[in-house]
Amino acid sequence: MARIAGINIPDQKHTVIALTAIYGIGKTRAKAICVATGIAEDVKIRELSEEQIEKLREEVSKFTVEGDLRREVTLSIKRLLDLGCYRGLRHRRGLPVRGQRTKTNARTRKGPRKPIKK
């Protein structure tokens, strides 16, 4: 298994799919990384040479991924909570933040229904 950005990349998968195992890299960014390094998207990780894997490491290191990205997201949410702005209040209450309706939907964000006590 190749190790990129502190993550063991599954070597039986194609390069594009395997790169998405890294937090912060989706399909679009994975394709861009493959184009930048000159590696075909349909080549499996185990078929890559050590220098190609090193190219992938260098390209991935240009992005904020894994622990740094998680920390950045957590700090930005914490900043909203500390400001006491509308978005921060929605985060604090566990409600949808981006204007979605809450009268009927939003079960994922609100959690399971609470029974009404009579």
UniProtKB/Swiss-Prot annotation:
Claim: Nucleotide-binding is one of the keywords in the record: no
Domain of life: Bacteria
One GO process term, biological-process aspect: translation
GO terms of molecular function: rRNA binding; structural constituent of ribosome; tRNA binding
Keyword entries, A-Z: Ribonucleoprotein, Ribosomal protein, RNA-binding, rRNA-binding, tRNA-binding
Residues making up the signal peptide according to the UniProt record: none
Region Disordered, residue ranges: 94-118
GO cellular component, one term: cytosol
InterPro entries reported for this sequence: Rbsml_uS13_C, Ribosomal_uS13, Ribosomal_uS13-like_H2TH, Ribosomal_uS13_bac-type, Ribosomal_uS13_CS
UniProt keyword annotation of Ribonucleoprotein present: yes
Similarity section: Belongs to the universal ribosomal protein uS13 family.
HAMAP family reported in the protein's UniProt record: Ribosomal_uS13
NCBIfam families linked to this entry: uS13_bact
Subunit structure comment from the entry: Part of the 30S ribosomal subunit. Forms a loose heterodimer with protein S19. Forms two bridges to the 50S subunit in the 70S ribosome.
Entry protein name: Small ribosomal subunit protein uS13
Encoding gene (name): rpsM
